[in-house]
């Protein structure tokens, strides 16, 4: 009985071994007939490789997107960030006060000369447009507070208080200043130029930045033009009167 059982076990083992060899043989023959790209093992490896590549590409894209966002963010930050520091504002305002005291003339009369005296004390390399724009904004900020009745003692922030004090020295409204500017502000030039598409507020602010010498030249030419207009009006009136007299004489 034991002998029979042993023979059966050996027979089954031989069958399993034979079947296993046959499967391996069939597998090898099948792989030989398959093209490399049709080999299941190659296909699986390629799929795994493609998957890894895709993951890498996705990772790169995400990284690039992240970098782009950072650059974009940084770019926006650099574009919109405040480039004039608190110290720069004080240097600029104090420089305007000192320039007028030392040179005996307003920085508006010699903007290039004024910029040369302070540009090395600013924390960045500012061009003339940046200087004039910053001066205009500081002036607008001061005048807004002034017109709203703000007093320097009511300003809690030390920087704001210092800026207000210096701005007051430079731009405190006076009757003399208002009289000097009245001829332009109240002239028809403002309305005429505004009709060309320039904002009146922008024009008035820009006019305040024009050197006094240039303003005087414009004012003199404007007066000459008004005199010529008055003379032309007088001649026109005289001419109409003569024509009217001729018509009256002819009807009589």
Curated annotation (Swiss-Prot):
<keyword id="KW-0805">Transcription regulation</keyword>
<feature type="compositionally biased region" description="Basic residues">
    <location>
        <begin position="18"/>
        <end position="27"/>
    </location>
</feature>
<comment type="similarity">
    <text>Belongs to the GeBP family.</text>
</comment>
<protein>
    <recommendedName>
        <fullName>Probable transcription factor At2g01370</fullName>
    </recommendedName>
</protein>
<dbReference type="Pfam" id="PF04504">
    <property type="entry name" value="GeBP-like_DBD"/>
</dbReference>
<dbReference type="Pfam" id="PF22757">
    <property type="entry name" value="GeBP-like_C"/>
</dbReference>
<dbReference type="InterPro" id="IPR053932">
    <property type="entry name" value="GeBP-like_DBD"/>
</dbReference>
<feature type="region of interest" description="Disordered">
    <location>
        <begin position="18"/>
        <end position="57"/>
    </location>
</feature>
<keyword id="KW-0804">Transcription</keyword>
<dbReference type="GO" id="GO:0006355">
    <property type="term" value="P:regulation of DNA-templated transcription"/>
</dbReference>
<dbReference type="InterPro" id="IPR053933">
    <property type="entry name" value="GeBP-like_C"/>
</dbReference>
<feature type="compositionally biased region" description="Basic and acidic residues">
    <location>
        <begin position="28"/>
        <end position="57"/>
    </location>
</feature>
<dbReference type="InterPro" id="IPR007592">
    <property type="entry name" value="GEBP"/>
</dbReference>
């Amino acid at each position: 009985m034991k002998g029979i059982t042993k023979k059966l076990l050996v027979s089954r083992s031989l069958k399993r071994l034979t079947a296993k060899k046959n499967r391996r043989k069939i597998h090898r023959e099948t792989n030989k007939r398959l093209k490399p790209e049709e080999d299941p093992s190659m296909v699986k490896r390629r799929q795994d490789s493609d998957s890894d590549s895709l993951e890498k590409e996705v990772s790169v894209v995400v990284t690039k997107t992240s970098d782009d966002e950072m650059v974009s963010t940084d770019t926006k930050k650099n574009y919109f960030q405040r480039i004039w520091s608190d110290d720069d504002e004080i240097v600029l305002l104090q420089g305007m006060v000192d320039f007028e005291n030392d040179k005996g003339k307003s920085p508006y009369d010699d903007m290039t000369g004024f910029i040369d005296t302070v540009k090395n004390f600013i924390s960045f390399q500012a061009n003339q447009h940046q200087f004039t724009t910053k001066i205009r904004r500081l002036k607008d900020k001061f005048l807004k507070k002034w017109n709203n009745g703000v007093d320097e003692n009511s300003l809690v922030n030390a920087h704001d208080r210092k800026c207000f004090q210096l701005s007051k020295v430079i731009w405190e409204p006076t009757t003399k200043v208002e009289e000097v500017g009245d001829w332009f502000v109240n002239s028809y030039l403002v309305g005429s130029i505004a009709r060309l598409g320039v904002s009146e507020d922008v024009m008035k602010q820009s006019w305040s930045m024009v050197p006094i010498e240039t303003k005087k030249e414009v004012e003199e030419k404007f007066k000459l033009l008004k005199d010529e207009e008055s003379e032309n009006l007088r001649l026109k009136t005289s001419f109409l009167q003569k024509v009217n007299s001729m018509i009256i004489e002819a009807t009589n």
